[in-house]
Amino acid sequence: MGKNVVVLGTQWGDEGKGKVVDLLTERAKYVVRYQGGHNAGHTLVINGEKTVLHLIPSGILRENVVSIIANGVVLAPDALLREMTELEARGVPVRERLLLSEACPLILPYHVALDNAREKARGAKAIGTTGRGIGPAYEDKVARRGLRVGDLFDKASFAVKLKEIMEYHNFQLVNYYHVDAVDYQSVLDEVMAVADLLTSMVVDVADLLNKAYRNGEYVMFEGAQGTLLDIDHGTYPYVTSSNTTAGGVATGSGIGPRCVDYVLGIVKAYSTRVGAGPFPTELFDSVGEFLCEKGNEFGATTGRRRRTGWLDAVAVRRAVELNSLSGFCLTKLDVLDGLDEVKICVGYRLPDGREVDVTPLAAEGWEGIEPIYEVLPGWKESTFGVKLRDGLPQAALNYIKRIEEVTGVPVDIISTGPDREETIVLRHPFDA
């Protein structure tokens, strides 16, 4: 048998998954995106050169690695084409390395229009979506009216289906949201221009992955967003529209649950969040500003400033449970360099004075809770670029050890910088 390794975020996204996937794919045959869409922003730095991927898996820069966009991903044709063009201009043979599932739902311009119209209508209660049509595309999928990549094999039938669904959505746009309708012909022309390209990359992804596993191949499954944004288990309604937890791997790609061998949870050494929603450890002081500036905490997809705060071990423990995590990769440890002290949230104090060590299930339950902190000594030495565990300051090692103790999960990888080489691998997921 082969080995299937899942890499996913344990917080609210932006944990550094792209770099880690790129690093680990040195030993993988396939890298698979199984949920989300081009609302992801995975940043890779290789030999100082920065690449930001939104839809294409992070393994695309590796020779002899096949990248797959599986059925759980909502696919925007224009975004895919744009990303492919940018990579090909840099000499990356994307068409030789990328495969698609025919079951991928398509994100089309009317989804984007709906997304933005809804956010505007929510006013102060806006979710803070990326405005890229992700949610409306998933809605169409669940309502069984969505168009999929496989529909492009019959272009005449696709045109008819598109007209029907656009009449439905344009009625909403014009009569409920009071915005302009989306032009049918322009959408049809846009999709037809890339239809042959998309269908040329289609394979039976589930069959391919199951055969690869039986044949001893190593496969990496790349999560997007983070556990606390999961549609079912996140801080609802301030969540994304897909299952970001490990359970989404099986439904989003077509492998069975028992075929997952190792789940690597990416945990940032502090916490960040983009957009609205609960964030108990959020900092509004100079330390929060320090983390934002030093950590360059601006969204790779939207450019929005990320909210920053101390590490929330209560929330991370929820991620441990939801994903059956095998190990952690701790990222951005170097951002904490220079602080006099570092804090870990180990519990919450409710408005009525009770103390709990588990996260609420919905956004309303987070209102008024206060973090309970453990305070540890900081370190002045630089951890940036350190490649051996023994090269880390003792205070940093103590911080890592305490994270392991309060979560019950070992830190198997430590990231000390953005480049793939700036990493300490204590236990490789494919060897675990």
Swiss-Prot record:
Database matches in SMART domains: Adenylsucc_synt
Binding site for substrate: 300-306
E.C. number(s) listed in UniProt: 6.3.4.4
Residues noted as binding Mg(2+) in the record, renumbered to the chain: 14, 41
Cofactor note: Binds 1 Mg(2+) ion per subunit.
GO MF assignments: adenylosuccinate synthase activity; GTP binding; magnesium ion binding
Location of this chain's protein in the cell: Cytoplasm
Subunit structure of this chain's protein: Homodimer.
Name of this chain's protein: Adenylosuccinate synthetase
Species in which this protein is naturally found: Edwardsiella ictaluri (strain 93-146)
